[in-house]
């Protein structure tokens, strides 16, 4: 949908559906169509993901999730649709492995404890990531083309690395103190995952 920040959520369900439908289909024509759709989905997702594979000469490594949106930039980051239209023009900034139907800023905004607001802030970014990972894993589980199955797992692995890299280097856990104290610095997972709808930590568990 063009006007929901749960973008990617539906494509994850779609991948799960076509993978499971393929596994039980008996009609050769239907099975051929499903095969074509699965193959196209995986190949095009990988092409999109590869736009984030950017080597940084200064760092002498790939640009990673931890490098995306330094704190000063994060604090000023906007969540409007107009801002998102600008963000999506630069996938090379997202960090190695990011793949989603919405810019990486959507995941980063929750580190600033931005509330659920479909127009101006966030709506369960990691929940949508989870749905896409689940869809890719279902393809790898139910499809019978090894090359495509391996590619689906590779996409999921690289996105998983993005999540790990971002969480490991840019977030932490602080449970004590007042909420203002716990939110004084960006990236406190104790607060991030406790936000109604915006967080939805269960989506990634």
Where are each of the predicted segments found?
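Glycan-recognition and catalytic cores of secretory/periplasmic carbohydrate-active enzymes
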Residues: 1-205
